[in-house]
Swiss-Prot record:
This is Small ribosomal subunit protein uS2. One of its GO terms (molecular function) is structural constituent of ribosome. Pfam families: Ribosomal_S2. The keyword Ribonucleoprotein applies. One of its GO terms (cellular component) is cytosolic small ribosomal subunit. Keywords: Ribonucleoprotein, Ribosomal protein. Belongs to the universal ribosomal protein uS2 family. SUPFAM superfamilies: Ribosomal protein S2. One of its GO terms (biological process) is translation.
Length: 259
């Protein structure tokens, strides 16, 4: 049984790609048709590739892989943080700092500084410092937490990276590839899929689509670490009585949405 149904994908808008003029020809094989100037992603392929991504992530987690979730645009930020935390992993959901992976030593120093500032507040050091200095420290902490809070406790460079919109996160993908870190990604019709190891053809601009795919991969991690019975299934994504099983039904839905 597929880990994500056709109906779930349709309801989340996973099938809507970009305007045809913005497409990347390398995504042609993942596109079913075009409607009103918008490419429609072939959801039968999305179902297949989502299954493969789920298996990949589950198996990686079963081998104690460290997974980094990356999604810095507003449509992805909340889901990336929530699902990374739920699955006991790590995330970056604000601007990717160049060298986050390839200059990990420097990043670790900044993380150490963040932890030092937190300790200063907890042990009472703030109480004996001038207010102006405390204000500066709080400002520094806020900035460090914004960019590094999601990887503050990451024990090492990740074994796997999951990316929402690799077109936007090109620097992150390049760093991962340089270090030999496999990349799992939601890939829209405007993206070059060549640098992605495990592709999920999908609309990466809709909040519900991002949430659906990201939550399912978090489920895979939980299953890999704790077993299938431990997977927490989101109620809104639970299988319903009806299924959209054919490409023809997808086209009917798309045409209806664009009518």
């Amino acid at each position: 049984m597929a880990v994500i149904s056709m109906k779930q994908l349709l309801e989340a808008g996973v099938h809507f790609g970009h305007q045809t003029r913005r497409w990347n020809p390398k995504m042609a094989k993942y596109i079913f048709t075009e409607r009103n100037g918008i490419h429609v992603i072939d959801l039968q392929q999305t179902v297949k590739y989502a299954d493969q991504a789920y298996d990949f992530m589950r198996d990686a987690a079963a081998n104690d892989a460290v997974v980094l979730f990356v999604g810095t645009k507003k449509q992805a930020a909340d889901a990336v943080a929530e699902e990374a935390v739920r699955s006991g992993q790590y995330f970056i959901n604000h601007r990717w700092l160049g060298g986050t992976l390839t200059n990990w030593g420097t990043i670790q120093k900044r993380i150490a500084r963040l932890k030092e500032i937190k300790r200063m507040e907890e042990d009472g050091t703030f109480e004996v410092l001038p207010k102006k200095e405390v204000a500066l420290l709080n400002k520094q902490r806020a900035r460090l937490e914004k960019f590094l809070g999601g990887i503050e406790d990451m024990p090492r460079i990740p074994d796997v990276m999951y990316v929402v919109d690799p077109h936007k996160e090109q620097i992150a993908v390049k760093e991962a590839k340089k270090l030999g870190i496999p990349v799992v990604a939601m890939v829209d019709t405007n993206t070059d899929p060549d640098d992605i190891d495990v592709i999920i053809p999908a609309n990466d601009d809709a909040i519900r689509a991002v949430k659906l795919i990201t939550a399912k991969l978090a489920d895979a991690i939980i299953e890999g670490r704790q077993g299938e019975d431990a997977v927490a299934v989101e109620a809104e994504f639970a299988a319903s009585e009806t299924q959209a099983d054919s490409i023809e039904e997808i086209v009917e839905v798309v045409e209806g949405d664009n009518a």
